[in-house]
């Protein structure tokens, strides 16, 4: 019998979603701080059969935590103790910013979904960088053979004009790349005005080129570079991004971010409307994110690492995406509904299926 769904219903479902997230994250970090993490590591460690190599890095598991949960790098070690093969931190911006006004995070429990308009709330690249460096060193000590991987997701500072976006991203790349295992350029959040315009290939080309050069120079090594795209792109735009990624020799693409669509939801229309603007994540995104993944795989073959995210809830969802061409898979929204042992459960089921 699983306890967490009952706990969620009694303790979290009635609470403001952002407050529930904050309390849950504090609980995860507290478990690490009190030494319970040592026990958790033994209980949740992915089976060796799940080790996966992407852009020259060995991941303990193909399944990781998407950006958005740990925005500022406060809980990287604690989250890896739950079984995630990688943790993508962020989105982080060049300057600290408070994000959008609250309330800005809403659950659609009937759909196992979330609507957010957080707006890249974070304390800025300069504040996050030391946490990343410390976490990376700690993970190396704790896991001397194959350690969990740290991804870093960067976005545009809201007050920076689009014309100055390249320089803003370069600040983040320069500051964060030395402590990142891989770097993600986020141009697909719907919650920063104008950000998605950067997905146009003519604008995206100089941005990705500049970020890649800045990251490698700052780190003194090649830092794998990926771009994260929206599910709302047309098929033609997806093909254009794929061609650009191949042309620039990017290391990969993450598909997909949240959607601005609201079709096919089980939640009452009035409730959805009350949530207002923002990106929808969770189960309703499953079909479209898989479609985008398949199209990217068709366009890029084996030349890029594809990371699938969007509507991932079960081990079967992870396997479906691996079968469709993803090398790595991420989740986030289902973590809120499934609880702290979600990643470990997925890893166990994946390992079991590989033995059979």
Swiss-Prot record:
Cofactor dependence: FMN
Pathway where this protein functions: Pyrimidine metabolism; UMP biosynthesis via de novo pathway; orotate from (S)-dihydroorotate (quinone route): step 1/1
Residue numbers binding substrate: 71, 116-120, 186, 191, 257-258
Any one GO cellular component localisation term in the record: plasma membrane
Cofactor note: Binds 1 FMN per subunit.
Entry superkingdom: Bacteria
Catalytic reactions on record: (S)-dihydroorotate + a quinone = orotate + a quinol
PROSITE patterns cross-referenced by the UniProt entry: DHODEHASE_1 (PS00911), DHODEHASE_2 (PS00912)
Any single Pfam family the record assigns to this protein: DHO_dh
An example molecular function term from Gene Ontology annotations: dihydroorotate dehydrogenase (quinone) activity
Entries under InterPro entries matching the protein: Aldolase_TIM, DHO_dehydrogenase, Dihydroorotate_DH_2, Dihydroorotate_DH_cat, Dihydroorotate_DH_CS
Protein's membrane topology: Peripheral membrane protein
Keyword Oxidoreductase tagged: yes
Biological role: Catalyzes the conversion of dihydroorotate to orotate with quinone as electron acceptor.
SUBUNIT field: Monomer.
Protein name per UniProt: Dihydroorotate dehydrogenase (quinone)
Organism of provenance: Pseudarthrobacter chlorophenolicus (strain ATCC 700700 / DSM 12829 / CIP 107037 / JCM 12360 / KCTC 9906 / NCIMB 13794 / A6)
